[in-house]
Amino acid sequence: MEVDVNGESRSALTTLPLPVAEASSPGKAEAEKPRCSSTPCSPMRRTVSGYQILHMDSNYLVGFTTGEELLKLAQKCTGAEESKGEAVPSLRSKQLDVGLARSSRLYKTRSRYYQPYEIPAVNGRRRRRMPSSGDKCTKSLPYEPYKALHGPLPLCLLKGKRAHSKSLDYLNLDKMNIKEPADTEVLQYQLQHLTLRGDRVFARNNT
């Protein structure tokens, strides 16, 4: 079924205008009511408010034509109205090919850009996704050491006397490049330095 951009239906079978009584019959209004397009078994309307649905595969990825492609298709249809019998099947097959290409391209971009944040490694350990080159990198300034690899710390941690001993942020545990065999040694070393630093802060406060 063909539908104009305005939403009025055009019937390819009858060219004569229908009487008002036939046009407003309840059967025709019921047939014109759009079916639910989420169920694949129900027949879908081919056009939805100016967009033409080309193809829907099993993953519910729908290929649309917009703008210039609709104009080109309309010009092809008007030019091919004289040889209607031969041109319509080829046009349909071409639309299906375009829809297949579009849906596969959508699927490629989906699998490329929407990666989960945690990627399982080969040996079964889960590792955090390292920041890529496109991510915003905060440079470490010499007079602001707490902005080294993370954003600014919350104010409750900055205003307190023992800010660094309370927060584990300056260790940057999630951004470290840990080698697999010696990761426990690195963590033990850093935790030892953390406790030493905390003891030093406590001793400075007591004196």
From Swiss-Prot:
InterPro entries assigned: UNC119-bd
Keyword Lyase: no
GO cellular component, one term: cytoplasm
Phosphoserine carried by residues: S25, S140, S167
Keyword Iron in annotation: no
GO BP terms, alphabetized: cilium assembly; epithelial cell migration; fibroblast migration; inflammatory response; negative regulation of cytokine production involved in inflammatory response; negative regulation of epithelial cell migration; negative regulation of fibroblast migration; negative regulation of inflammatory response
Chain positions covered by the region annotation Disordered: 1-41
UniProt keyword terms in alphabetical order: Acetylation, Cell projection, Cilium, Cilium biogenesis/degradation, Cytoplasm, Inflammatory response, Phosphoprotein, Protein transport, Transport
Sequence positions bearing N-acetylmethionine: M1
Superkingdom assignment: Eukaryota
Localization terms from the record: Cytoplasm; Cell projection, Cilium
Quaternary state and interactors: Interacts with UNC119 and UNC119B; interaction preferentially takes place when UNC119 and UNC119B are unliganded with myristoylated proteins.
Main function: Regulates the macrophage function, by enhancing the resolution of inflammation and wound repair functions mediated by M2 macrophages. The regulation of macrophage function is, due at least in part, to its ability to inhibit glycolysis. May play also a role in trafficking of proteins via its interaction with UNC119 and UNC119B cargo adapters: may help the release of UNC119 and UNC119B cargo or the recycling of UNC119 and UNC119B. May play a role in ciliary membrane localization via its interaction with UNC119B and protein transport into photoreceptor cells.
Entry's family note: Belongs to the UNC119-binding protein family.
Full protein name: Macrophage immunometabolism regulator
Species of provenance: Bos taurus
Lineage: Eukaryota, Metazoa, Chordata, Craniata, Vertebrata
